[in-house]
C-alpha cells in the first residue's frame, strides 16, 4: 500500500564545515546564504539528495549532513489496531509495555527501465531471533528531538515548576469531567472521548513525571551547583570571563522575574481557553482565509471529532469555573461583572451561538454570513485581545532574550567541561548501556497464536518449535522524545528490539542529563 508523503531518509555522508561557518559569520553573511554556499561547495553525491547544516556542541562545531531520499515507501504489514494501541497512552512509562506498536514498510527505487524495484541497501541490520538476556551490551540508534537544550538554574525557578503542576491540574480537571459524564454517551461518541481521555492522561503523567523527577533528584540544586563550580573555575583561570558569566546569570534571573507573572496567564490561555471547543470553531471562521478549502475541511472535522453538546458544555463549565475561582483575566466580562453565573453563561452561549454545530459552521465557512456579534466569536476576540496586548508580545520578547542568554551560559559551561553532550536536534545519535534484569517473556507459538487467532488470523501452533521469547526488556540507555521506535542493537550489530519509552524518572532528561537516571 503506497503511503503518500512518507519517505526514507538515508545518511550518506557527514562533513565538518565548522571553518566555513566561522569564516562566513565573521564576514557578516546571513545564515541562509551561508548554508547555500556550503551546499554549493560540497555538491550532492547524487541528484535528489537532501543536505542540512546542523550546529553541534552549543555552536562549537557545525556539520553538513547529506541524505539520500527514497519517496516510494509502502506499507507491508501492521498489527490490528487494538493490539497496536493496547494499553493506550495511559500505559506510557509503565512496565511491562505490551502494545504491538510497529509497522513493516518496504521502500522502492526506480530501475533502469522505470520499473519500481525493492530497495536493497548495502548495509542492514540482521534480526537476532534468539532474543536477548539480562546484562547484555546494547545501543539505541536514532534521531531524537525531545531534549533540545539543557536548563540553567534560572529556568528551574519555582514559577516554572508551578506552571507544570498547573498544567497537570487542568489535565486532571478535564479528565474528571469526562469520566463523570462518559457513561451517558453512545458507544460511538464514547470512543472519541476515550481517545481524549487517553491523550490527556498521557500529558498529565508526562508533566507530573518531569516535576517529580526534577524534585526527587534535586535538579534545581544540581543546576545551581554546576554554575557555582563553573564560576569558581573561571574566577581562578580567567577573571574577565568570570565577570561575563556573572553578568549573564544576573541577566537570566532578571528576565525570569519579568517572565514569572506572565507564565500563569499563558497557562490559562493555552490550557483552558484554547481547549474550549467553540473557541476553536470561532477561530476557524475568523481565520478561514488563511487555509485552503481542503485543509479547512480537515480542521473542521478535527474540531468536531467528538461532537456531543452535553459533554462539551460540562467541560466548558468546568474550565470557566476553574478560571473564575482563580480570578483569571480571561473570565468573560459578563461573569466578571457578576451579571450572570458561569453555568448560566455557558447554557446561554450554547443556545444562542451558531458556532456550536458542525453543519452550521460549515455553512458559515462556505458563505459570507457575519458572526461578529455571535457570543462565541465575541469571547474569542476578547481573550485574543487580552493575550496579544498584555501577555503574548512581552512573553515572546523576554523568552527570546532569555534563550540568547541561556545559550551563552551553556556555551561557557560546555567550554569549562560541565556539559559534555549536545542538544538533540534530529541528527543521528547512539546511546549505549546494558539490558536490565527486568524481562517479560511468553511462549512464542502457544500464547501468541492464540491471541492472534482471536483477530481472525489462521495461525498454526507448532508445539515442537514452542520456546520462551523475551518480548519486553529494560536498558539503561539514554532515550528522549523522538526515540520511540528507534532500533536497539546488541554488540554484534544485530537488531534485538525497538525502543519504546523511558521510565517516568527519566523524564528529567528533557532538561537535565543525569546519567544515573537518564542513561
Label each region the model flagged.
Residues 1-519:
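Terminal presequence/propeptide segments associated with secretion/organelle targeting
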